Design a protein with these regions (language model features):
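Bacterial Sec-dependent N-terminal signal peptides
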Residues: 1-30
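A non-transmembrane, solvent-exposed segment enriched in polar/low-complexity residues
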Residues: 21-144
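Amphipathic alpha-helical repeat scaffolds of TPR domains
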Residues: 145-156
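Alpha-helical repeat scaffolds
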Residues: 165-175, 204-205
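N-terminal "domain-start" segment that seeds a small globular fold
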Residues: 185-220, 327-337
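Conserved redox-active cysteine motifs that mediate thiol-disulfide chemistry
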Residues: 232-249
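Thiol-based oxidoreductase modules, predominantly thioredoxin-like and allied folds used
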Residues: 258-272, 282-292
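Thiol/disulfide oxidoreductase modules built on the thioredoxin-like
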Residues: 278-282, 289-336
Length: 338
């Protein structure tokens, strides 16, 4: 009951504040970031809008702090980051004096009404029971589907802990202002593609090139009687490289026992493929996809993305079940079953 009362109180305040903050008058702001020590002095800080990554302003750290001042036409969900570091924090850029204290254990913005709500969202997400997440998420998105708080919710556990059906429902239920944002449109499309290629669905075919430039299809490998372990990867991707020993192990063990390992080279320049193959000692076939066709069709938001497809073309497993230490046992579950 206390949690629901907290949510109700925050929702009332959010509604009142957003009404005040959507007046057409320009927004003037001062954003001050306080950094822990002088080692940051001289470094560049970038203020960007979340999701679009559009740069709003830059500053240089002096005296262990940075300051952004300006005028914006509406409240925006942003983040400030010391360039090329993991020192960053989210905030809502709005009228008033906003402070980010990087000495805090958890850096959250203070000083303005909408940023107080952002802090409350984090607090609620930290304390809410998992079984209440769906109901609370539905309530908040219903109230804030067309304002800046709705965009904050989209980046919170009140969205990303939901299943794909609920996520699609939240985004499609947004008001036109938010739903017309390009990154929301893309996320709806991605989620629907992910849903269409989830475990139990038939594989979706696509074309790419092999290492010598010939056109090849996923169906050249899938549906031929073998289990196919598909790995979408790139040469610059650290987590992708960490999966290569696991892929090599199952490839060497089971390449003659009903398993085909297939790499899909994505989000990378074709010139990087051969050096990566040589460096990592990759011996399995590759499809080169420079047009992002495969990752779009399969709703992939990050790599590596690995899936196991059965002999009949049915998707059997995706991601966690065939990543890391789970890969070999999962493969063996299918290959060695009686």
């Amino acid at each position: 009951m206390k949690l629901l009362n907290k949510l109700a109180a925050v929702a009332i305040v959010a509604t009142a504040l957003f009404t005040a903050c959507t007046e057409p008058a320009p927004i003037s702001y001062t954003l001050t970031g306080i950094l822990p020590d002088s080692s940051f002095n001289g470094q560049e800080v970038i203020l960007r809008e979340n999701y679009t990554r559009a740069i709003i302003a830059t500053d240089t750290v002096e005296g262990n702090k940075f300051v952004f001042e300006g005028v914006a036409d509406t409240a925006r969900y942003c983040y400030a980051q010391v360039k090329n570091t993991r020192t960053f924090a989210d905030l809502i850029l709005e009228n008033g004096n906003i402070t980010l204290d990087f000495n805090a254990e958890r850096v959250l913005p203070t000083g303005t009404g909408l940023n107080d709500i952002l802090r409350d969202i984090y607090a609620v997400c930290d304390t809410i029971e998992k079984e209440n997440m769906e109901a609370v998420s539905a309530e908040w998105f219903a109230k804030h589907g067309n304002d800046i708080i709705g965009i904050v919710l989209y980046g919170s556990p009140l969205f990303f802990t939901l299943d794909a059906d609920a996520q699609i429902a939240r985004l499609e239920g947004m008001g036109e202002i938010n739903k017309e944002k390009e990154f929301i449109k893309k996320e709806i499309s991605r989620l629907k593609a992910r849903k269409a290629t989830e475990v139990g669905q038939p594989f979706t075919d696509f074309e790419g090139k092999d290492a010598v430039g010939n056109t090849v299809k996923l169906s050249d490998y899938v549906g031929k009687g073998n289990y196919v372990l598909v790995d979408m990867w790139a040469s610059w991707c650290g987590p992708c490289k960490r999966e290569i020993p696991n892929l090599a192990e199952v490839h060497n063990l089971y390449k003659d026992k009903g398993l085909t390992v297939l790499g899909i080279f994505v989000w990378d320049d074709i010139k990087n493929l051969q050096p990566a193959i040589e460096e990592e000692k990759i011996t399995w076939a590759q499809i080169i996809d420079t047009e992002k066709v495969s990752t779009t069709l399969y709703g992939v938001s990050g790599i590596p993305s690995i899936m196991l497809i059965g002999p009949d073309g049915t998707i059997l497993e995706r991601d966690a079940a065939v990543r890391g230490e789970n890969m070999k046992p999962t493969i063996e579950k299918y290959l060695l079953k009686k």
